[in-house]
Regions:
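Right-hand nucleic-acid polymerase module
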Residues: 39, 92-93, 110-193
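Conserved polymerase palm-domain catalytic core
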Residues: 1-78, 82-100, 105, 109-118, ...
Length: 193
């Protein structure tokens, strides 16, 4: 999906917050995230404030999925989401309803290359991992990106550009992530660097 519409976000915030000074502060925070090309969209998702704001923004969608579509198994992180169901035809029908709601209410568009209907046994790609009923593996692209970042951090440490503490924090972060998937071989590879 495209980035959040800042005007819509402020409108949603005003539904919950009556204090104009606080709204003014939030507008300044939101507008500070906008790109120079387009001041109407964008929140950097690594920012803690953004994580809260994207959840507020997407709450309308969560409620739509839960109460209007009556989806029983739905997961969302920021603007990535999955809907699980036993009925392929029903899922196909929901795509149009989801697309229309997102466009009408939140001015968001589904990315056409990121809509999949597949069996759970073939793996559900979500948040950098491919999830199976009994295990999960790191997506190949995620794995490559992770090792590139580790190599860059290691290079920076060897050249005195970062402290050993920073290197260790990165390694521990990746090792923690790998505990949640079949990453034993990758853990050994990282420990061998």
């Amino acid at each position: 999906m495209k980035l959040l519409g800042n005007k819509i976000l402020v409108k949603i915030l005003k539904e919950y917050i009556s204090n104009e000074n606080f709204i003014w502060l939030l507008k300044n925070v939101i507008n500070s995230f906008s790109s120079e090309k387009d001041t109407s969209v964008g929140l950097p998702l690594g920012n803690l404030t953004s994580q809260l704001l994207v959840n507020i923004y997407m709450n309308k969608f969560d409620q739509f999925v839960k109460h209007k579509l009556k989806v029983k198994c739905y997961m969302r992180y920021a603007d990535d989401f999955i809907i699980l169901a036993d009925d392929k035809k029903w899922l196909e029908e929901q795509i149009t309803l989801v697309r229309e709601f997102l466009h009408r209410e939140l001015k968001l568009e589904l990315h056409p290359d990121k809509i999949f209907i597949k069996t759970v046994s073939s793996g559900v790609d979500f948040l950098g991992m491919v999830n199976f009923p009994d295990h999960r593996i790191l997506r190949t692209k995620t794995k490559k990106r992770m090792f590139k970042k580790i190599d860059n951090k290691y290079h920076d440490w060897r050249n005195g550009l970062i402290a050993e503490k920073s290197l260790n924090q990165s390694w521990k972060s990746y090792l923690g992530m790998l505990k949640h998937c079949n990453g034993y071989g990758m853990v050994k590879k990282i420990e061998g660097i």
